[in-house]
Amino acid sequence: MKLIIGVITLFPQMFDALKSGVIGRALKQDRLTLSCWNPRDYATDPHRTVDDRPYGGGPGMVMKFEPLALALKAAKAQLGENTKVIHLTPQGKLLTQAIVREKIHASPLILLAGRYEGIDERLIEAEVDEEWSIGDYILSGGELPAMVLIDAMTRLLPGVLGHKDSASQDSFTAGLLDYPHYTRPEKIADRPVPSVLLSGDHEAISRWRLKQSLGRTWQRRQDLIKRRSLSENEQRLLDEFFEESS
């Protein structure tokens, strides 16, 4: 499986940060292809203007239709005319791990990173297939959300992470938060590593990890527990967690 991503951005240099770590490894392995198109390169006036004042007044500037449309046209000429366009915006639906898993099978994709007060709505109506948000907060532009989505998709590609089970055991993969992790030394001040993790009993370790995952999810994200149908074993483990924590 190979992930092919195009990004429409006024700041393509920001994506140089992705050349490190897991994503950098995927790029070197040719598991990920990442290309950027700058709308400023498609502006037709001498000043290469990409924004203008909003109709109706108000603060800030709005990204213009034409430079964005031409940048998208160039991206689709390379990636394919039917390539889906995803606009990263706080007005979009909330991005979840389940959606990320879907998106890696929808490659190639074009990610549209807006700036300023937003994008001319007519561009969104004409060119955008989906709108996604990474959370209920505001950033200076869509570049960081685009990088979040690229990172989340890339780490699901087979062979990109160091261990084949790394992605499958992440938070949200099973609809639960991750369990606690420990490494050497065995004791720091008065905080030892839980003895079960030193036992070598893989069944007991798996049971402990699931119990901690269930308990941590209940403590921090009850919405995830409430939308999940717990098995008898999971409910028993959650009850044990409550007893041990009280």
UniProtKB/Swiss-Prot annotation:
Q: Which UniProt keywords apply?
A: Cytoplasm, Methyltransferase, S-adenosyl-L-methionine, Transferase, tRNA processing
Indicate where this protein resides in the cell. Cytoplasm
Can the keyword Methyltransferase be found in this entry's annotation? yes
The signal peptide annotation in the UniProt record is none
Organism domain of life = Bacteria
Can the keyword Transferase be found in this entry's annotation? yes
What residues does S-adenosyl-L-methionine bind to? 114, 134-139
UniProt-listed HAMAP family: TrmD
- UniProt protein name: tRNA (guanine-N(1)-)-methyltransferase
Q: Which organism is it from?
A: Coxiella burnetii (strain RSA 493 / Nine Mile phase I)
